[in-house]
């Protein structure tokens, strides 16, 4: 059966080399006679997988030694609660958290944070339907905030930070679920980075948390032990049974990325892929994307047909061409092409060619 180009926003496409290797090792991991899915998480085989996975991630992102890598469960949605529970405990209560609201996922984080702290919306792009990132000089920060939170890429609106904000001595926390490993970043500018795996890392089930060591030990008394970063770190991400198979696939993805040349090489490919789509969108009025160039996401490209009555035809005909999962989020409609690291440039070329043909046919 021919493989399709999968533009799903998540769970997203995996590198074909990773899928092939996982298939080959499914029933017998490297001569062990075991599938990774049935290994003891404390056995020699999985301990090796875990250590290699964490070491490769540290290498890919140049993570400094004073940062811990935690492999957790619950996705970024769970971290919306876990982050404040871990960071506000040492502050006078109620603590204040500053948020920059750039869209759907930022809003979800803010909604959850109200349960644990006072919330200050330091900046928001809601005035223009979340189509931009507010300039840093417009932010109204709280001097003694527990932390400042940003979502570096909004998958629904297709809005991405093109800068790392300077927030002074207040810890900067970032949800990087949809653009981690897609561009080079300076980890030392952040106190905490978290990311669900199912976009640029692997299948759903494991959540990456990168936390500076001075951020440990500040949990609220109500924080469940399994979600206390200090305890998770002390138990090497095995306070409870970890999501072993998603960790294994994440490890294969990290090794694939290293073979491609690492994050710097991936970033150049991602720039090229995004440019192909945006250049075409800017050349026509048949399709519309309203995000300013500086804030356009390299990972998620939403676009709309000027004649929305053609939406159904677009999806049906794209599916027939092996271009799948292009329907936009239900909250905004239209179309969305998610072009994470695993999407080859050939897939983007095929999509743009289809879009041009569709315009000729119906424009």
UniProtKB/Swiss-Prot annotation:
Instruction: Tell me one GO biological process term.
Output: L-serine biosynthetic process
N6-(pyridoxal phosphate)lysine (modified residue): where? 199
Write down the top EC class of this protein: transferase
What InterPro entries does the annotation carry?
Aminotrans_V_dom, Pser_aminoTfrase, PyrdxlP-dep_Trfase, PyrdxlP-dep_Trfase_major, PyrdxlP-dep_Trfase_small
Provide GO CC annotations from the record: cytoplasm
Cofactor(s) needed, names only, are: pyridoxal 5'-phosphate
What GO MF annotations does this protein's record show?
A: O-phospho-L-serine:2-oxoglutarate aminotransferase activity; pyridoxal phosphate binding
Keyword annotations: Amino-acid biosynthesis, Aminotransferase, Cytoplasm, Pyridoxal phosphate, Pyridoxine biosynthesis, Serine biosynthesis, Transferase
State if Nucleotide-binding is listed as a keyword.
Answer: no
Q: Which SUPFAM superfamilies match?
A: PLP-dependent transferases
Reaction catalysis annotation: O-phospho-L-serine + 2-oxoglutarate = 3-phosphooxypyruvate + L-glutamate; 4-(phosphooxy)-L-threonine + 2-oxoglutarate = (R)-3-hydroxy-2-oxo-4-phosphooxybutanoate + L-glutamate
User: Where is it chiefly localized?
Assistant: cytoplasm
Matching PANTHER family: PHOSPHOSERINE AMINOTRANSFERASE
Read off the NCBIfam families from this record: PRK05355.1, serC_1
Cross-referenced HAMAP family? SerC_aminotrans_5
Function text: Catalyzes the reversible conversion of 3-phosphohydroxypyruvate to phosphoserine and of 3-hydroxy-2-oxo-4-phosphonooxybutanoate to phosphohydroxythreonine.
Protein name, entry field: Phosphoserine aminotransferase
Protein species of origin:
Janthinobacterium sp. (strain Marseille)
């Amino acid at each position: 059966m021919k493989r399709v180009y999968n533009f799903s926003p998540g769970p997203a496409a995996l590198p074909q080399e990773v899928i092939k290797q996982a298939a080959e090792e499914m029933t017998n991991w490297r001569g062990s006679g075991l599938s990774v899915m049935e290994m003891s998480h404390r056995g020699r085989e999985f301990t090796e997988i875990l250590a290699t996975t964490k070491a490769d991630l540290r290498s890919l992102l140049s993570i400094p030694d004073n940062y811990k890598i935690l492999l957790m469960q619950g996705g970024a949605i769970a971290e919306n609660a876990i982050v404040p529970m871990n960071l506000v405990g040492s502050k006078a209560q109620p603590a204040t958290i500053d948020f920059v609201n750039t869209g759907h996922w930022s809003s979800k984080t803010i909604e959850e944070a109200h349960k644990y702290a006072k919330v200050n919306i330091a900046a928001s792009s809601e005035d223009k339907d979340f189509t931009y990132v507010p300039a840093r000089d417009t932010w109204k920060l709280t001097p003694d905030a527990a932390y400042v939170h940003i979502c570096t890429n909004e998958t629904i609106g297709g809005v991405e930070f093109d800068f790392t904000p300077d927030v002074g001595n207040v810890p900067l926390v970032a949800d990087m679920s949809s653009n981690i490993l897609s561009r080079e970043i300076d980890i030392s500018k952040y106190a905490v980075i978290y990311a669900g795996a199912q976009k640029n890392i692997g299948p759903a089930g494991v959540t990456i948390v990168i936390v500076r060591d001075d951020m440990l030990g500040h949990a609220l008394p109500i924080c469940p032990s399994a979600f206390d970063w200090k305890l998770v770190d002390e138990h090497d991400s095995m306070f409870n049974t970890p999501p072993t198979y998603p960790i294994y696939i994440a490890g294969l993805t990290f090794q694939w990325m290293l073979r491609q040349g690492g994050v710097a090489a991936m970033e150049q490919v991602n720039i090229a892929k995004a440019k192909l789509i945006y250049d075409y969108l800017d050349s026509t009025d048949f399709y519309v994307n309203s995000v300013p160039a500086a804030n356009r996401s390299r990972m998620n490209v939403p676009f709309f047909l000027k004649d929305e009555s053609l939406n159904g035809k677009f999806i049906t005909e794209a599916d027939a061409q092996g271009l799948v999962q292009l329907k936009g989020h239900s909250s905004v409609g239209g179309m969305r092409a998610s072009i994470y690291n695993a999407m080859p440039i050939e897939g983007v070329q095929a999509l743009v060619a289809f879009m041009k043909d569709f315009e000729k046919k119906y424009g």
